[in-house]
């Protein structure tokens, strides 16, 4: 682990250059720099503008359905026989995941900037659906770049995006997953800077995206903190979330970072195991490098070439992680651990049977970690987990693996 000094606050970053310690920054083509700086200026104005915040709050309540509930998982808690388990139910949001929180915020920014075309990248298709949804709501054309592999394994979401009026462009380069989709979206943006807004779906990319996405997603943790105090009269002992690029995780983690009594764990995609290359555990098994405009932990070879990762879950199938997570790892504030495909699949089925909630494969990784940790904790202790998405999109993948023809 890189030793990083502990700051006075874990919530004060990034600095004016968009850095969290040695991570983050703005590594972009010269043609994009003026646009990135425009975006940063607009973001700084918007976040201090009461009218912008009021519109965001109004759409959150009436379009997304916020606040999302805090749910005590009674049967899972009883089954595991340890800590009380609570879920932040982000899968109940409009479009079925946390992704919409960020999309609403960014499309309001795009409108403020006078942009007339939206582009986005997507892995699991949840961010693509959320982007297409907000584009439809605000009457803007939308192009979604999606790896060809993901187009195949996320058919329901591809259909949803098309229904919503978005153009889905399959990307066959590389392994045809999220990294490749992001590369294509960046290429599009460079050539269409005047009219196009790039709606990034995770807490990565060049500054100000990691900060912006985190702030739009922090509504999760802010609500959860209030709800937990109302339900239990105190904060949780442990907060857990799955981490791909890391937007759902930073959204629930950030409001708790300066509460020393709260332990925080991020769960990476361990895929088929960390020995080979078939995983996406960037922090557990990667090293710092530069990808998609920011310095962060990446899966790369000794020459700095980005490896093709693997995860059963399309949304975690990314060979990097948001820069703030890299910094939180190095400061020791957050622990990052891997969960394998088979453990996530088991957790998916366990939650479905015990609580009547079909989770997405992404948060199923976090559920698997909850299943490991809860029995080792006291019955008076509390776990809070971010249930970031619903599993409708994954039933074909799971059905195939379990040998159930759909």
From Swiss-Prot:
<dbReference type="InterPro" id="IPR006653">
    <property type="entry name" value="Trp_synth_b_CS"/>
</dbReference>
<dbReference type="InterPro" id="IPR036052">
    <property type="entry name" value="TrpB-like_PALP_sf"/>
</dbReference>
<comment type="similarity">
    <text>Belongs to the TrpB family.</text>
</comment>
<feature type="modified residue" description="N6-(pyridoxal phosphate)lysine">
    <location>
        <position position="99"/>
    </location>
</feature>
<dbReference type="InterPro" id="IPR006654">
    <property type="entry name" value="Trp_synth_beta"/>
</dbReference>
<keyword id="KW-0057">Aromatic amino acid biosynthesis</keyword>
<dbReference type="GO" id="GO:0005737">
    <property type="term" value="C:cytoplasm"/>
</dbReference>
<dbReference type="InterPro" id="IPR023026">
    <property type="entry name" value="Trp_synth_beta/beta-like"/>
</dbReference>
<comment type="pathway">
    <text>Amino-acid biosynthesis; L-tryptophan biosynthesis; L-tryptophan from chorismate: step 5/5.</text>
</comment>
<keyword id="KW-0822">Tryptophan biosynthesis</keyword>
<dbReference type="Pfam" id="PF00291">
    <property type="entry name" value="PALP"/>
</dbReference>
<keyword id="KW-0456">Lyase</keyword>
<dbReference type="GO" id="GO:0004834">
    <property type="term" value="F:tryptophan synthase activity"/>
</dbReference>
<dbReference type="InterPro" id="IPR001926">
    <property type="entry name" value="TrpB-like_PALP"/>
</dbReference>
<keyword id="KW-0028">Amino-acid biosynthesis</keyword>
<protein>
    <recommendedName>
        <fullName>Tryptophan synthase beta chain</fullName>
        <ecNumber>4.2.1.20</ecNumber>
    </recommendedName>
</protein>
<comment type="function">
    <text>The beta subunit is responsible for the synthesis of L-tryptophan from indole and L-serine.</text>
</comment>
<comment type="subunit">
    <text>Tetramer of two alpha and two beta chains.</text>
</comment>
<keyword id="KW-0663">Pyridoxal phosphate</keyword>
């Amino acid at each position: 682990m890189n030793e990083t000094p502990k700051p006075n606050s874990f919530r004060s970053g990034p600095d004016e250059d968009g850095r969290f310690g040695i991570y983050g920054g703005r590594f972009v083509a010269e043609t994009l720099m003026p646009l990135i700086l425009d975006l940063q200026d607009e973001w700084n104005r918007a976040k201090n503008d009461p009218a912008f915040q009021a519109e965001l709050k109004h759409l959150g309540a009436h379009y997304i359905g916020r606040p999302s509930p805090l749910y005590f998982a009674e049967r899972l808690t009883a089954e595991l026989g340890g800590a009380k388990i609570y879920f932040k139910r982000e899968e109940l949001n409009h479009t079925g995941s946390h992704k919409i929180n960020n999309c609403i915020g960014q499309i309001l920014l795009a409108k403020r900037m006078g942009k007339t075309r939206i582009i986005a990248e997507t892995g699991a298709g949840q961010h693509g659906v959320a982007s297409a949804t907000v584009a439809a709501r605000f009457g803007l054309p939308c192009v979604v770049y999606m790896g060809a592999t993901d187009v195949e394994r996320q058919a329901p979401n591809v259909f949803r995006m098309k229904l919503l009026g978005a153009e889905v462009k399959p990307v066959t380069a590389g392994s045809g997953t999220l990294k490749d989709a992001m590369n294509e979206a960046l290429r599009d943006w460079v050539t269409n800077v005047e009219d196009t807004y790039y709606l990034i779906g995770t807490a990565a990319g060049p500054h100000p995206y990691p900060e912006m996405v985190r702030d739009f997603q922090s509504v999760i943790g802010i609500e959860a903190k209030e709800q937990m105090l109302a339900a239990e009269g105190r904060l949780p002992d442990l907060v857990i979330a799955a981490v791909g690029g890391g937007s759902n995780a930073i959204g629930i983690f950030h409001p708790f970072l300066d509460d020393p009594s709260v332990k925080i764990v991020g769960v990476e995609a361990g895929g088929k195991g960390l020995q080979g290359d078939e995983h996406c555990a960037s922090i557990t098994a990667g090293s710092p490098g530069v990808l998609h405009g920011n310095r962060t932990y990446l899966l790369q070879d000794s020459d700095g070439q980005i490896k093709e990762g693997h995860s059963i879950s399309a949304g975690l199938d990314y060979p990097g992680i948001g820069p703030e997570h890299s910094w939180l790892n190095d400061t020791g504030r957050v622990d990052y651990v891997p969960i394998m495909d088979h453990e996530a699949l088991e957790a998916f089925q366990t939650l479905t049977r015990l609580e009547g909630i079909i989770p997405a494969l992404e948060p199923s990784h976090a559920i698997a970690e909850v299943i490991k940790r809860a029995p080792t904790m006291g019955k008076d202790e509390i776990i809070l987990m971010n249930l970031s998405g619903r599993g409708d999109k994954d039933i074909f993948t799971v059905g195939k693996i379990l040998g159930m023809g759909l």
